[in-house]
Regions:
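Periplasmic/cell-envelope proteins involved in peptidoglycan metabolism and beta-lactam response
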Residues: 1-51, 55-56, 73-74, 139-150, ...
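Conserved catalytic neighborhood of penicillin-recognizing serine enzymes
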Residues: 21, 70-144
């Protein structure tokens, strides 16, 4: 199917299919043509290199919020908002002002609605609540990165992630992300 995207300069792609109940890999395609050096065909694009996952990482953030007492019915205000970019209130840099893809604000929305519509502002507010990194005073890894690790994502290793992490601002392999969805 990658050939159908050639006019968009797409020459490589990957697919991972996992049985959710067991985590068994049912199919994995790392390249459309193993022998094509022009597209790095011998690199398994399903496993490496890592790529930014975009909004597909948002469920990891919301799962961490559920562990801290939120539910799908929890209300979040989707309104103009600003945050310290690192999540640290003492961060001296310009505030981070997330926007939704549609450029609109939707007022009070449930977590269910925010995730179903992939609203960015509620996702960032959720990460601001959950925190990026773990609280050292808790026995369990409880930040978004800790939750990602518990779900099998090992590629979030930088010490400087900001709140855009929940919008796909970190790198992950397709195999790890797909596996996390099966946990």
């Amino acid at each position: 199917q990658v050939s159908l995207l050639a006019d968009k300069n797409a020459h490589n792609g990957a697919l991972v299919s996992i049985k959710p109940s067991t985590g068994e890999i049912l199919a994995m395609v790392g390249s459309p043509d193993f022998n094509n050096e022009a597209i790095s065909g011998q690199i398994n694009m399903a496993d490496s290199p890592t790529r930014q996952p975009g909004s597909s990482i948002k469920p990891v953030n919301y799962i961490a919020a559920f562990e801290k007492g939120w539910t799908p019915a929890t209300l979040i205000w989707d309104v103009p908002s600003e945050f310290p970019p690192s999540g640290d209130p003492n961060d001296p840099r310009e505030p981070y002002r997330p926007v939704n893809y549609d450029g609109e604000f939707h007022g009070p929305v449930t977590v269910r609605t925010a995730l179903a519509n992939s609203f960015n502002i509620p996702a960032v507010k959720t990460l601001d609540f959950v925190k990026i990194y773990d609280d050292p005073n808790t026995p369990q890894k409880d930040g978004m990165i800790g939750m990602a690790e518990r779900l099998g994502i090992t590629s979030f290793t930088r010490p400087d992630y900001g709140l855009s992490l929940t919008l796909g601002g970190g790198d992950v392999s397709l195999l790890e992300l797909t596996s996390a969805y099966s946990v």
